[in-house]
Amino acid sequence: MSCCGGNCGCGSGCKCVGCGGCKMYPDLSFSGETTTTETLVLGVAPAMNSQFEASGETFVAENDACKCGSDCKCNPCTCK
């Protein structure tokens, strides 16, 4: 069964999650079986001030350099 009807997207840790991603279609076979649909709700929260802003820690976006490739697996390429 393909993830999100083939529209998988990369999430945190370069794991394939969600829909509306890179539009890869790893599984185009139809067997007539009943499938279960999952819904992933993503949201945006307001920025929060923190007393640790100047602590010297650096944060890197986990999804910066990956995209969903064949078989809904993440590849280390940027999806544009």
From Swiss-Prot:
Q: Which GO terms describe its molecular function?
A: metal ion binding
Record keywords: Metal-binding, Metal-thiolate cluster
Transmembrane feature ranges:
none
Keyword hit for Glycosyltransferase: no
Query: What function does this protein fulfil?
Result: Metallothioneins have a high content of cysteine residues that bind various heavy metals.
- Which family does the UniProt entry place this protein in? Belongs to the metallothionein superfamily. Type 15 family.
Which PANTHER family does the protein's record reference? Answer: METALLOTHIONEIN-LIKE PROTEIN 2A, METALLOTHIONEIN-LIKE PROTEIN 2B
Please give the name of this protein.
Answer: Metallothionein-like protein type 2, MT2-4/MT2-25
